[in-house]
Every structure is written in C-alpha cells, then in structure tokens.
C-alpha cells in the first residue's frame, strides 16, 4: 500500500510526457489544500479519429462531481490526489473503478484541471471501454445500480446509464434473466417518464 501523501496514476500503456508533471501537480495541491485531486489535459493515441478530441473540452478550472461523471471528463493517467482526503466507496460490481475513485474524492474535497498537457492516453479496440458484449453490459448495469445508492448527489446520471445498459440486455436470448431485465426496463422508463411529467407540470 502507498504511504505517501499524494498518489498519481499511470495505467497500462498510457504514459507521461511532461518531466515536470508531478511537480506542477504537487505544487498546486500544496498551495490549495481544499482540493482533493487535480488532473490535466492529455493527448490521445487511437486508431479511431473520433477519439482524438475526446478531452478537448477540458480547461483550467474547478470541476464538479456531476460534470466529471456526466461527461467522463478525467483522463486517469493525469490524476494526482491527496490520499488523506479519499473516502473509499466501492460498489460490489466495479468495471470502471476510476470514476468510482473520482466521485469518492469529490466527497472529500474539490477537483481541479490544470492547463497543461502532461501525458498520452492510449485507446485501442481491446480496451474495456470499447468492448460491446452482454456480459459487460450486465456488469455495468449492476455497477450503476449500486452507484445510485453510494453517490446520491449524482443519482440521476447513474439511473440514466443503468437504464441504457438495461436496454442493451433486452434482446439477449442466451440469458435466463432477460425477462427480468425487460420488466425492470419497462418499470424504470415508466418512473422516469412520470418524474419528467411531474417536473414539467410543476414548472408550467
């Protein structure tokens, strides 16, 4: 287990490109103790040109938990966080552990993006984020279902993603649970429709 005050990530075949990356991030964190985590921009290496601008929207400012979850804002290889501000919350089913980590850190402090490019995020067809199969969809459905309870402040996003993955499981004839997923999908969509209708009615 790491014992230092700060922890930085560089997973798999991602890599850092700025030799002063860690110094810049530690300096920021030391000067701004109210922040639990900081991150920065990255270049993307991918065979798919659609991926190249994935993080172009990032700019130097504070980000909320809702923002980073809604748009999946943070490149994992850019992260440095204060270990003492981490309040670990983890669902039993966890495919994408990075977003769980970031939301947990958002509970312990603020999040900030620094204005420099400090690494390369490599995206390829074999990665978990690019896979498309029913086993993965089922696992993600359960992860978001649990995250609804663990992170109530961003429950709306978890619910939408849960319904999205549930919809992808409706036609999986190889699973005994398909009928359950179909029933849950109908019920969740009904609740979502009623909620939106009530909100619109109240506003009008």
PLM features: residue spans?
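Glycine-rich, basic loop-to-helix element that forms the pyrophosphate-binding segment
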Residues: 1-2, 24
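Short aromatic/hydrophobic "clamp" motif used to bind/position activated sugar donors
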Residues: 7
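The conserved acidic donor/metal-binding loop of glycosyltransferases
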Residues: 11-15, 41
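Conserved donor NDP-sugar-binding/catalytic core segment of glycosyltransferases
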Residues: 20-52
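Conserved nucleotide-sugar donor-binding catalytic segment
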Residues: 40, 54-135
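Catalytic core of nucleotide-sugar-dependent glycosyltransferases
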Residues: 66-67, 103, 121-125, 130-155, ...
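Amphipathic alpha-helical repeat scaffolds of TPR domains
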Residues: 158-172
């Amino acid at each position: 287990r790491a014992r230092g005050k700060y922890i930085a990530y560089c997973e798999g075949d991602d890599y850092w490109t700025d030799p002063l990356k860690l110094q810049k991030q530690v300096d920021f964190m030391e000067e701004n103790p109210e922040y639990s985590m900081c991150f920065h921009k990255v270049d993307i290496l991918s065979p798919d040109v659609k991926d190249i601008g994935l993080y172009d929207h990032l700019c130097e400012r504070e980000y909320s938990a809702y923002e980073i979850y809604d748009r999946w804002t943070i490149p994992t290889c850019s992260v440095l966080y204060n270990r003492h501000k981490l309040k670990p919350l983890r669902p039993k089913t966890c495919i994408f552990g990075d977003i769980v980590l970031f939301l947990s850190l958002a509970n312990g402090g603020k999040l900030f993006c620094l204005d420099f490019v400090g690494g390369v995020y490599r995206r390829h067809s074999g990665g978990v984020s690019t896979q498309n199969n029913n086993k993965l969809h089922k696992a993600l459905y359960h992860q978001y279902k649990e995250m609804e309870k663990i992170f109530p402040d961003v429950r709306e996003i978890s619910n939408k993603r849960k319904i999205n993955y549930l919809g992808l499981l409706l036609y999986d004839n190889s699973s005994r649970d398909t009928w359950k997923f179909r029933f849950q999908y109908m019920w969740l969509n009904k609740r979502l429709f009623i909620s939106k209708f009530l909100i619109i009615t109240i506003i009008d």
